[in-house]
Amino acid sequence: MQSSLARPLRPPVLAGRGGRRGLVAVARCHAEAAPPVGTASRAPAGPYTGRDPEVKKPAWLRQRAAQGEKYARLRESIGELKLNTVCVEAQCPNIGECWNGGGGAGGEGDGIATATIMVLGDTCTRGCRFCAVKTSNKPPPPDPLEPLNTALAVASWGVDYVVLTSVDRDDLPDGGSSHFAQTVKALKELKPGILVECLTSDFRGDLEAISSLASSGLDVYAHNIETVRSLQRIVRDPRAGYDQSLAVLKHAKACREGMVTKSSIMLGLGETDEEVKQAMMDLRAIGVDILTLGQYLQPTERHLTVREYVTPEKFQFWKEYGESVGFRYVASGPLVRSSYRAGELFVQNLVRNNKTGSSSS
């Protein structure tokens, strides 16, 4: 039976704004009864953009506006120091929960606040069709003081775990790897006990750039495959690729004993269950430890149309499946993003145990 979403949409349009990691905006589905587990309305096949005016946001995707004391304090500090965060630039729906320490948009949580700092500026050289980060072929040069300023800011917040990410910088000889590495080293010098996760670009597959960053003192090397193999050219910038992303993660894992690696997959772009399972197996085959899965939400009508709204029950299925095939930690849910509660205690213990094991062997 044809879905009411399966009607002609506007022709494909390459997103005028794009990037790698942002995700969010208003996602909506029909106000009818919720579909069975693992099913949802689908748009036509193909790289369609635009929004269907007849669809409505499902209840499980509604999120209160971010508020709370920790959130307000962190937002003020980031603004004063002129730092970029993927939480803001990519319109992440979990900004309140992560910045408040796991307590939702405004409640009290476990106290583990996580902010993802975006280095190398706020302008990406690539134009992935899912992302809200702005793009340009010639972004401004990196701020040479950014590594130190970032380290000073993070050290002042008193956090034990920080995520550093970046836009793609194909305009730089090393893709920005050395700038990234300088930031990690500055953080470790100011606060040796802090755990640092780096969510990186693919550096155009440059293994030396990957090695440089992987050897900088970081604790978790993250790089996202974003979607299943068959949808790569539709979803990501042509300069990115499934096999190239796997090669990045494989090389990072080999750079240091005890290295924890991580990746993420968006659902709702038209992938099949078998394709998701294959992507998981491909990641496990190269030793990836941590996986996150979340719903793709369309940032603007110029970005890819949501083709499926995956139910919370199906996300729970994927969490259990991921654990069954060997991932050491799986975060799976409609609003989960790459850095979702990255620093929670289980992940911190996983990283520290890996360090202890590698140093004693």
Curated annotation (Swiss-Prot):
Pathway note: Protein modification; protein lipoylation via endogenous pathway; protein N(6)-(lipoyl)lysine from octanoyl-[acyl-carrier-protein]: step 2/2
What is the uppermost EC class here? transferase
> Cofactor binding mode, per the note?
Binds 2 [4Fe-4S] clusters per subunit. One cluster is coordinated with 3 cysteines and an exchangeable S-adenosyl-L-methionine.
Q: Among its keywords, does the record have Iron?
A: yes
Gene3D superfamilies associated with the record: Aldolase class I (3.20.20.70)
- The residues listed in the UniProt record as binding [4Fe-4S] cluster 2, with positions renumbered to this chain, are C124, C128, C131
Pfam annotation, one family = Radical_SAM
Q: What is its main location?
A: plastid
Location(s) in or outside the cell = Plastid, Chloroplast
Spell out the PROSITE patterns in the cross-references.
RADICAL_SAM
Q: Name one GO molecular function term.
A: 4 iron, 4 sulfur cluster binding
Mention any one GO cellular component term assigned to this protein in its UniProt record. chloroplast
Which residues are [4Fe-4S] cluster 1-binding? C87, C92, C98, S339
Reaction catalysed by this enzyme:
[[Fe-S] cluster scaffold protein carrying a second [4Fe-4S](2+) cluster] + N(6)-octanoyl-L-lysyl-[protein] + 2 oxidized [2Fe-2S]-[ferredoxin] + 2 S-adenosyl-L-methionine + 4 H(+) = [[Fe-S] cluster scaffold protein] + N(6)-[(R)-dihydrolipoyl]-L-lysyl-[protein] + 4 Fe(3+) + 2 hydrogen sulfide + 2 5'-deoxyadenosine + 2 L-methionine + 2 reduced [2Fe-2S]-[ferredoxin]
Q: By its UniProt entry, which InterPro entries does this protein fall under?
A: Aldolase_TIM, Elp3/MiaA/NifB-like_rSAM, Lipoyl_synth, Lipoyl_synth_chlpt, rSAM
GO BP terms: lipoate biosynthetic process
Quote additional remarks: This protein may be expected to contain an N-terminal transit peptide but none has been predicted.
Name the record gives this protein: Lipoyl synthase 1, chloroplastic
Organism, scientific name: Zea mays
